Amino acid sequence: MSGGHQLQLAALWPWLLMATLQAGFGRTGLVLAAAVESERSAEQKAIIRVIPLKMDPTGKLNLTLEGVFAGVAEITPAEGKLMQSHPLYLCNASDDDNLEPGFISIVKLESPRRAPRPCLSLASKARMAGERGASAVLFDITEDRAAAEQLQQPLGLTWPVVLIWGNDAEKLMEFVYKNQKAHVRIELKEPPAWPDYDVWILMTVVGTIFVIILASVLRIRCRPRHSRPDPLQQRTAWAISQLATRRYQASCRQARGEWPDSGSSCSSAPVCAICLEEFSEGQELRVISCLHEFHRNCVDPWLHQHRTCPLCMFNITEGDSFSQSLGPSRSYQEPGRRLHLIRQHPGHAHYHLPAAYLLGPSRSAVARPPRPGPFLPSQEPGMGPRHHRFPRAAHPRAPGEQQRLAGAQHPYAQGWGLSHLQSTSQHPAACPVPLRRARPPDSSGSGESYCTERSGYLADGPASDSSSGPCHGSSSDSVVNCTDISLQGVHGSSSTFCSSLSSDFDPLVYCSPKGDPQRVDMQPSVTSRPRSLDSVVPTGETQVSSHVHYHRHRHHHYKKRFQWHGRKPGPETGVPQSRPPIPRTQPQPEPPSPDQQVTRSNSAAPSGRLSNPQCPRALPEPAPGPVDASSICPSTSSLFNLQKSSLSARHPQRKRRGGPSEPTPGSRPQDATVHPACQIFPHYTPSVAYPWSPEAHPLICGPPGLDKRLLPETPGPCYSNSQPVWLCLTPRQPLEPHPPGEGPSEWSSDTAEGRPCPYPHCQVLSAQPGSEEELEELCEQAV
């Protein structure tokens, strides 16, 4: 028998007991109650007190007997002197005896066998005794019990008739036989307040109620715990009922479209992570709050037992503690987004976000606060909020809007040289890919497929990615060599994570359009795949490095390309051997537009000097057109000399070989103050295109060697305070101490040997003092 049936019987057995008692004792109890009630009404007990006339101080001779009043006479108390009467004495009416009235007569009845024919009835004898002066009549019916029935018929006698038998009758007769005189008093016995049968009935009722209450308490206490409703289970069931469900439709998935960068996932349907079966048409799926989908029949038992997502351990009842601990790294998982787990690459989860997230206003800087980075030299305390790099949007912008965004987002990219413009125009055409979304800034991009070119740079780091070919999806982002501190310092990030060639968020990445390499004013196409700057393969002609490597690799040696012309540093030259410390917080000028740079370089190269080197002038805005980028390289040598000095100041941990190196003239504040030549402040209008990607702006910071006195502080007639400033200092003559009032005789942008240098960042002044080792050291540090 099961436990439930046993509990039901245990609860019902008190009621069954009461029904059995009523069935067994119902009729008998009713009859007994009726008989007792009739007896109570028919027989009234009497208390007979016998007090001897002889005084007994101890009181042992006093008798208290109990009898029953007969119905033949009235029930009244009486008292008198005790006197015995024979039964035959009451048969005749003689007047011989003159008895005093007020006595109590006791009559002992004999057995009916001894007197089969009595002379008078008992009722007649009781009348006769009363007529003779008895105040009460006592009948001893010990030998004739049937006499009680004869005395029940009422005759209306006024004196009481009491029946006595048993032990009480023997005690009274013994007192009589001793001829002792006594005074007898007959009293009515009061009925008890609670008769015996009433007490038993009450005890039965009370006991039954107590048993019922005890059984109920035991049933409640002994109830199995599994039958009790668990609050946690109820909450879990409610949470599961609130989860969304849907019918899987493969056609809808194809209609929504696979994104261009998820081509690896279009060959198979999503998979249930529990049963490892693909979703088929019409299957009912359960969508958990963490946006993971499973078969409803597979995940519901798991949720009832564990209350967490099988993949990300998201708790459906208490919230996502795990996702909250990740903080901003999971901020892009908004409600309503779907995540697809692609099983073609085991161990890599591919998250595809809808385009609404990438194109919506949630990409603003307010939604995700920028992470603090190292303090760059181009920023001063109190100059306003720092601008951080934003990821590219998926939709093309107008040329003016892109230029304004680039100028607003990258105010610290003011040390950008024209060599970058030249190298941008000389890049081979980038491999075009379809329009795609940009990822959030904190996503690693593992498993993404891009069209890249084979890298021409083979680093000696432990994780150099030199095997990425066309349309190769690299997943080795987490093992890229990130040990160089300079890589982190230049980019402005304190993170130790670097992207590989397959990541479009590589800090050294920019986009080159497909087309004529001579067009420097072309807008970067949003359909072009961003490629790493170290993936340039020289084809046919000398390629200019597309970016500046700041690392410790010792395999880039540009030996014997330049010769020093001048004297080595020493005390006889009068040139100071150490430069004053340069503050890292001085403001930097913004990069000019490419067309203005080309115009300035073309106009400055034939003349060799400026007409008014002491007055800054603003260049007019030229019309965009094809310009030979190779003509820009010679005019930017002084700018990269300034960059070299800033780079050597940026890496003080590297050892210097030989004696202390001579600082470049561009880094001396006193020389720059004496020769403030060629100060050009081009107009920066939105109509001029920006030839480089905004992502590469923070790579090269402005030269910290420029003195702040060269920069305009108040608006003047030649420039506006809101316009960027470009400075170039290119002395042709050796920089030697000049007499007072005498300055350099000539300024030019040519190199020492009269030929343009294919490495702009290694161009030096024509008469720069120093040795070949120092030149190699500077070139090596620049690389």
From Swiss-Prot:
Q: Where in the cell is it found?
A: Cell membrane; Endoplasmic reticulum membrane; Nucleus envelope
Catalytic reactions on record:
S-ubiquitinyl-[E2 ubiquitin-conjugating enzyme]-L-cysteine + [acceptor protein]-L-lysine = [E2 ubiquitin-conjugating enzyme]-L-cysteine + N(6)-ubiquitinyl-[acceptor protein]-L-lysine
Q: Which regions of this chain are Cytoplasmic-facing, per the record's topological domains?
A: 219-783
Extracellular-side stretches of the chain, per the record, are: 24-197
User: Compositional bias (Pro residues) spans?
Assistant: 578-594
Skewed-composition ranges (Basic residues): 385-395, 548-568
Q: How is it modified after translation?
A: Autoubiquitinated.
As given in the record, the signal peptide range reads 1-23
Q: What is its EC number?
A: 2.3.2.27
How this chain sits in the membrane, per its record, is: Single-pass type I membrane protein
InterPro entries referenced in this protein's UniProt entry, alphabetically: RNF43_Znf_RING, Znf_RING, Znf_RING/FYVE/PHD, ZNRF-3_ecto, ZNRF3_Arkadia_E3_ligases
> Does the entry annotate any disulfide bonds, and if so which pairs?
C91-C119
User: Carbohydrate attachment sites?
Assistant: N62, N92
Residues in RING-type zinc fingers run 272-313
Q: Which Pfam families match?
A: zf-RING_2, ZNRF_3_ecto
Q: Where is the composition biased (Polar residues)?
A: 598-614, 632-648
Q: From what superkingdom does this record's organism come?
A: Eukaryota
Task: State which tissues express it.
Answer: Expressed in fetal kidney, fetal lung, in colon cancer tissues, hepatocellular carcinomas and lung adenocarcinomas. Overexpressed in colorectal cancer cell lines.
Q: In which pathway does it act?
A: Protein modification; protein ubiquitination
Region span, Disordered: 363-406, 421-477, 514-673, 731-760
Which molecular function GO terms apply here? Answer: frizzled binding; ubiquitin protein ligase activity; ubiquitin-protein transferase activity; zinc ion binding
> Associated disorder, per UniProt?
Sessile serrated polyposis cancer syndrome: A rare disease characterized by multiple and/or large serrated polyps developing in the colon, and an increased personal and familial risk of colorectal cancer.
What does the UniProt function comment say about this protein? E3 ubiquitin-protein ligase that acts as a negative regulator of the Wnt signaling pathway by mediating the ubiquitination, endocytosis and subsequent degradation of Wnt receptor complex components Frizzled. Acts on both canonical and non-canonical Wnt signaling pathway. Along with RSPO2 and ZNRF3, constitutes a master switch that governs limb specification.
Q: What else is known?
A: Acts as a cytotoxic T-lymphocyte tumor antigen, suggesting that it may be used as a target for cancer immunotherapy.
Oligomeric form and interacting partners: Interacts with AKAP8L, NONO and SFPQ. Interacts with FZD5. Identified in a complex composed of RNF43, LGR5 and RSPO1. Interacts with RSPO2. Interacts with LMBR1L.
Q: What is this protein called?
A: E3 ubiquitin-protein ligase RNF43
